[in-house]
Amino acid sequence: MKTVNIYYIFDASVKIRGNAGHRIEENISRISRALDFSPYKTKLHIIGYRDRAFFAKPHERIGAYGNPDFAEGLKMLGNVLDYGRKYEHAKARSVFIWHTSGTVLEGWKKELEKLYKNREFAFGLRYVVQHGVADRSTKEALYRFTETPERILHHFSEGRLCSLVENIVRG
């Protein structure tokens, strides 16, 4: 049976204070709950980023501080993908969800290009959940990450994730 890897990358900087931070925590809990009751084999990897990247747990309170350094999150994601490739021999398909506040620091391009060399990332489904208004450099990051504007969303529901997982497993 195929394993579906779900990589949830989120902004944990000062930009998520208030409503955006609450929505990120809520989304992480919903995604975790949806995957707990999924009949398919799934793995959830939650990566937060600010000045440094870190792993988060599904029902953990997220402190908002630091700068939104997306390159740090991409480095951590690259490390996780490399580790998974070394130790996972089963066929896997991946969904990447990037939850952003709408601000990204410069320096992400090199890390994103490295990720596109990774087969799992290049052929995975990539979505962005965006809050706030994005400036020009952030819009470029959003479009380069997803490659299609239809995958830049304002909300990502449990139902959408469950149907994606089902389509991946059956397809």
Map each language-model feature to its residues.
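Von Willebrand factor
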Residues: 2-58, 93-99, 133
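Phosphate/oxyanion-binding active-site loops and adjacent basic polyanion-contact surfaces
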Residues: 19-24, 65-75, 108
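Short coil/turn segments at secondary-structure boundaries
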Residues: 20-22, 58-60, 110-111, 141-142, ...
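Surface-exposed acidic, glycine-flexible loop patches that form ligand/cofactor-binding
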Residues: 33-39, 80-90, 117-120
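Loop/turn elements at helix/coil->beta-strand transitions in domains of secreted/extracellular proteins
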Residues: 39-43, 90-93, 120-127, 148-151
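Disulfide-rich extracellular ectodomains of metazoan secreted and cell-surface proteins
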Residues: 39-40, 53-55, 63, 123, ...
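VWA/integrin I-like adhesion module and closely mimicked acidic/polar interface patches used
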Residues: 67-68, 102-145
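Von Willebrand factor A/integrin I-like adhesion domains
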Residues: 133-171
